């Protein structure tokens, strides 16, 4: 199995390319328009709308939906596309800070899709340190209180990213982690942030800022992790992504998505077995899910998500609402 080629014949903008437009929008708005038209609210609104058009704010999201739906309808591997949608939903990002316009599409295309050919651990690691997820969960605002920077600052930790990594992305609350575990996980993640500058603002590349990282060892769910800078996070992710509770949580969620809202142990067990035998290889896990879905489909009914249902109907009956690629060309002027 290989990464499925895109069926979209038009331009597919890169994450960095779109981020440059996002940077232009933020900088022009904050540093120029607000100052220039501070006494003329109507003119400011008018110029801001022109800036949105110039930087593709309303174009990128529509373009990404066209790429996504074209892929689902026309791909020669619809099952692969279904799994792509599943993982995009599992590692979802919010609608805040213009992320849908400037981040969601390339995040799903460049981070989630390629890692579907790797292990679950690989995917968790790459998602966790992606620009989209770091910004979605405000990890750039998380500063270790005893870090070189934090010890002389009033800034402190932000638990959002650590809590979501534990609760929604890996082991789930069923593992029984405590608030102390969340705090320790947050300490591990301090320092992972966008590289801020006067020109790039919050659109800089992700890096590990040791000056913001909480020093010393951390204890998470009873295990001590030695101080190891940026490698600390990868070590913890390795344990979380291969934890029995994580396997059970993800396998259950996969079966719930593809088979029934109430998956049984006999449905879930083969998926966990495939996980164990393959070291978490997602292609192997996906095959196990498909086998279970095929075996139990005649005895179970599953109400599809609206988007999934419409896309399936489009494939079955040969209709499409997706604009042709040449009609999605955009003039950034």
Predicted regions and their residues:
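Short coil/turn segments at secondary-structure boundaries
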Residues: 56-57, 70-75, 95-100, 111, ...
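Structured, charged N-terminal subsegments at the starts of enzyme catalytic cores
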Residues: 49-56, 60-81, 85
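Short, flexible active-site-proximal loops enriched in glycine and acidic residues
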Residues: 79, 83, 95-103, 135-138
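Residues forming anionic-ligand binding surfaces in small-molecule and nucleic-acid pockets
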Residues: 90-91
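His/Asp/Glu-rich metal/cofactor-coordinating catalytic motifs and the adjacent surface-exposed loops
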Residues: 4-52, 103-109, 113-333
